[in-house]
Design a protein with these regions (language model features):
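N-terminal small/polar-rich segments of proteins
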Residues: 8-84, 119-160
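Acidic, negatively charged sequence tracts
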Residues: 77-98
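Generic structural motif
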Residues: 24-27, 86-92, 109-113
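N-terminal signal peptide c-region/cleavage motif recognized by signal peptidases
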Residues: 3-5
Length: 160
């Protein structure tokens, strides 16, 4: 037989914190091929061209982003009477340290690009920073009717 006398007490704490990282996105500039003449052939907008697309992603420093850039392979006429299309190809590059400078960008090398947000050079320990995604590419203008041709570029961002 055991005898136990005295006082016993215990304290348990269960603390749970849910921290949701935030990501803010903004189209700084749309990709724009402008007006082109039928049968012009290939028209390129290169990295650094004034008409390239620029997309900004603001996030917490050290946050990892998975960025996917998808697009249709052709531009379509907005007119219902015109079935013509324009072949369309794009490329993408990014900076991940809060500076909008295409000369310091890294080209996308895979379908899903893994990007780690770093602090800007002027304040490397800043809580927030930005990545810039640059969209550029080419269209091939054949013998097509005059019209407005459009297409979509979809940028998907998953943050971890």
């Amino acid at each position: 037989m055991f005898a136990f006398s005295g006082t016993a007490s215990a304290q348990f704490l269960n603390i749970q914190l849910d921290v949701e990282p935030e990501v803010d996105t903004m189209i700084e500039q749309s990709l724009n091929f402008g007006q082109v003449v039928s049968n012009t052939g290939e028209v390129n907008i290169g990295l650094g061209d004034t008409n390239m697309g620029i997309f900004r992603v603001s996030a917490l420093r050290s946050q990892k982003l998975l960025i996917t850039v998808e697009h249709s392979n052709e531009l379509r006429s907005v007119s219902n009477s015109n079935n013509a299309t324009i072949p369309f190809d794009i490329e993408a590059a990014y900076t991940n340290f809060g500076v909008n400078d295409y000369r310091q960008s890294t080209p996308f090398t895979s379908v899903i690009e893994e990007v780690l947000i770093e602090g800007p050079p002027i304040n490397p320990t800043a809580t927030w920073s930005s990545a810039y995604v640059y969209i550029y590419g080419s269209i091939d203008i054949g013998n097509i009717p005059s019209d407005i041709y459009t297409g979509e570029v979809q940028i998907t961002i998953v943050y971890e």
